[in-house]
Amino acid sequence: DDRIKVIHKKNGGLSDARNAGMQIMAGTYISYIDSDDWVANDMYEKMMYAIKKNDADICECQFEKTAGIVKSNKEQQTDKVTILKKEEALKAVVEEKINPVVWNKIYKREIVDQLYFEKGKYNEDEFWTYQAVERAEKIVQIEDVGYYYFFREDSIINETYNIRKLDALEARYQRMKYLEKYPEIYGVAKRQLVFNCMYHYQKGLRFLSGSDLKKLKSKVKAIYKDISIDKN
């Protein structure tokens, strides 16, 4: 099948692999699937129907965590959709009503063109998704479970707290700064960031020590200082 393109490259991590694919993308839409996950047979059919019918730029489906056994999702199938305009969608991202992961969505190519993933980040999706949403005029969410996230004990998402997870806090901080042009959403993002700081600080006190703990404390202190002098 000449529609399939195989890229041979040195392993540069998840972001680098996604970026390599984006550099040769040729279709009207793009999606990202992690190699150990899988999708429902009709996921793309349903999402393409929804994105075209509603003239949307992004479509998001529901996902299910699984250890490898998938129950039939017939009882979960529904025609219900949620349609969000740009600012509604940005607020939904901050409130986690739109999940920051990239793999349960499809995107119009034009809105993510040149929007590459930051290399070397632990939570790369957190740095990327809000920017993609900000480029979209309309997002549609469907209620069907279409994506199956393979859950295993040694998954990077479920390992014990470590200093690399501080990337998630940095992503939330960058997101807050990015959203300053949307005053109402900015306030929500700022409050969320305070809670994120508290979470990471508590985790750090429990699991980190030495230079890692010092780094975390310094990061949280810098964010709090920035927030405290912000008059918005």
Describe each model-derived feature in a short phrase:
Residues 7, 140-142, 188, 230:
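General small-molecule cofactor/ligand-binding pocket signal
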Residues 170-189, 225-231:
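C-terminal, non-catalytic tails of nucleotide-sugar-dependent glycosyltransferases
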